[in-house]
C-alpha cells in the first residue's frame, strides 16, 4: 500500500512541473511567433492514471493474489474473508455470512457502484506453514535451586474410651457396670 502511494506521489511530482510550465506560458504574453510545445498532449494527459495502470500491474487486475500465507480466519488480516459453511448452518443463517462490498479502487476514473461485491479467488493461504525447528539446539533442563521447606509431622496420641456393657445371662441381678477399654491412636497432623 505504501509502495503504491509513493509511486503515485513520485509520478505526480514528475508531471506537475510540466503542467505548471504550461499554465505559466498561458499567463505570459507570447513573445515568440511560433508556439512551442515541449511535450506531446496525448502522452501528458494520460500520465497520472492510464500510464500508472498500464505500466504497473499492481494497479491493474490482479489474477494472482500476492498475500502472505496465513489462516483465513486470522484476526490480524487486514481484509475480511468470511467462510460460507455448506451444510453446517441452516439457509437463514447462511444469509448472514456475506462478503463485504468491494473496496478495491476502480480501474477507470468512474466510481464503481457499491452493490458490486468482491469474490475472493481461491488460494492456498489457508495452509499454515509451521516454523522450522532448530535441531542443533539441545534443551537445557531447568533445575529448581529453591528448596521448599515441608512441615514436619508430629505424632499425637489421643485416648479413646470404649464403653461396652457386658450382660451375662444368669439369675443374679447384674448391675450395669460398663467396662472401659483404653486404646492409643497415633495420627500425623500436618
Swiss-Prot record:
List the coiled-coil residues. none
Q: Which residues cross the membrane?
A: none
Q: Which residues carry this modification: Phosphothreonine?
A: 166
Grouped into one coarse class, the protein's main location is secreted
Instruction: Keyword check for Acetylation, yes or no.
Output: no
Cell compartments where the protein resides: Secreted
Tell me if Glycoprotein is a UniProt keyword of this record.
Answer: yes
Glycosylated residues: list them: 142, 152-154, 157, 163, 170, 186
Looking at the UniProt record, the site noted as Cleavage sits at: 126-127
A GO-annotated cellular component: extracellular space
> GO BP, one example?
protein stabilization
**In-chain residues carrying the UniProt-annotated modification Phosphoserine:** 148, 170, 187
Which tissues and organs express this gene's product? Mammary gland specific. Secreted in milk.
Sorted UniProt keywords:
Glycoprotein, Milk protein, Phosphoprotein, Secreted, Signal
- UniProt-listed InterPro entries: Casein_kappa (IPR000117)
Signal peptide location in the record?
1-21
- In which family does this protein belong, per the annotation? Belongs to the kappa-casein family.
Please explain the role this protein plays, according to its UniProt record: Kappa-casein stabilizes micelle formation, preventing casein precipitation in milk.
**Record's protein name:** Kappa-casein
In the record, what lineage is assigned to the organism producing the protein?
A: Eukaryota, Metazoa, Chordata, Craniata, Vertebrata
Amino acid at each position: 500500500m505504501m509502495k503504491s502511494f509513493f509511486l503515485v506521489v513520485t509520478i505526480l511530482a514528475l508531471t506537475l512541473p510540466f503542467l505548471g510550465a504550461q499554465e505559466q506560458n498561458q499567463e505570459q504574453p507570447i513573445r515568440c511567433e511560433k508556439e512551442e510545445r515541449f511535450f506531446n498532449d496525448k502522452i501528458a494527459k494520460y500520465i497520472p492514471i492510464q500510464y500508472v495502470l498500464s505500466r504497473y500491474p499492481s494497479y491493474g487486475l490482479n489474477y494472482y493474489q500476492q498475500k502472505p500465507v496465513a489462516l483465513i480466519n486470522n484476526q490480524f488480516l487486514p481484509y475480511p474473508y468470511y467462510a460460507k459453511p455448506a451444510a453446517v448452518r441452516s439457509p437463514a443463517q447462511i444469509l448472514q455470512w456475506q462478503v463485504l462490498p468491494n473496496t478495491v479502487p476502480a480501474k477507470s476514473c468512474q466510481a464503481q457502484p457499491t452493490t458490486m461485491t468482491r469474490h475472493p479467488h481461491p488460494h492456498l493461504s489457508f495452509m499454515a506453514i509451521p516454523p522450522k525447528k532448530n535441531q542443533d539446539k539441545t534443551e537445557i533442563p531447568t533445575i529448581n535451586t529453591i528448596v521448599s521447606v515441608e512441615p514436619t509431622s508430629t505424632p499425637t496420641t489421643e485416648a479413646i474410651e470404649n464403653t461396652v456393657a457386658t450382660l451375662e445371662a444368669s439369675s443374679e441381678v447384674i448391675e450395669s457396670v460398663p467396662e472401659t477399654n483404653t486404646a492409643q491412636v497415633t495420627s500425623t497432623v500436618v
